[in-house]
């Protein structure tokens, strides 16, 4: 009996979530919304594919934007 050859899975290189020119800032609402769930929760570092430093900066920026009422704390639109 012949064995089937093992196929290698090609790993697609994913693009970084934040482009080199983008700055994480509480005023950049389009960028902040990409890292929030539909319910308004901050997504984890593993899901976002951010570095630890970027995740900390993103969390602080989202919290500042929430306090200034630029983005809602919860998104309960049903």
Swiss-Prot record:
This is Small ribosomal subunit protein bS18c. One of its GO terms (cellular component) is mitochondrial small ribosomal subunit. The gene is rps18. It holds the Pfam family Ribosomal_S18. The lineage of its organism: Eukaryota, Viridiplantae, Streptophyta, Charophyceae, Charales. GO terms for biological process: translation. Residues 1-16 have a biased composition (Basic residues). PROSITE patterns: RIBOSOMAL_S18. Transmembrane segments: none annotated.
